[in-house]
Regions:
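Catalytic phosphate/metal-binding cores of nucleic-acid and nucleotide-processing enzymes, i.e., regions
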Residues: 1-141
Length: 141
């Protein structure tokens, strides 16, 4: 769907900004290990997004090995727990013909995500991904 994670990032950032959110792209080389790609704030909330681009991901996919770098899952889960389970980090994955939103409420063994997990949402479009994201963020309030 997107040629690269950077291309996905640009489209997602633009859509979030058009909805009134402030988006800060994090340069990973300048931060500690595990910090996600984007910090998003606005409309009375804030959350982190880790972005992935996985061309092999399709609507038919049931299990996915996510290419999290060392420290990314622990950082996200620790952030969630330290904020009393009301602040979120999500991994958003752009696939070939779908998107996946992973709410980082737990650590996934061996980076394997079952797409029927209660923390995982498969979406057919970027619009559906964003609607699901905002629904999850608002559930935390």
């Amino acid at each position: 769907m997107y040629k690269s994670e950077n291309a996905f990032s640009k489209v997602l950032s633009l859509k979030l900004k058009l909805l009134g959110y402030s988006v800060t792209r994090i340069e990973t080389g300048l931060t500690c290990q595990g910090v996600p790609d984007m910090f998003v704030q606005g409309n009375g909330t804030d959350f982190w997004l880790e972005l992935k681009n996985e061309k092999k991901l399709t609507l038919e996919t049931t299990k996915l090995k996510v290419h999290w770098r060392p420290g990314q899952q622990p950082w996200a889960y620790t952030y969630y727990m330290q904020h009393h389970k009301n602040k979120y980090t999500f991994t958003t994955i752009a696939g070939d013909n779908c998107f996946v939103l992973v709410s980082m409420k737990k650590v996934f063994t061996d980076n394997v995500v079952m797409l029927n997990d209660e923390c995982v949402f498969k979406c057919k479009s970027l619009t559906e991904l964003m609607e699901t994201l905002f629904k999850e963020v608002n559930n935390a309030k």
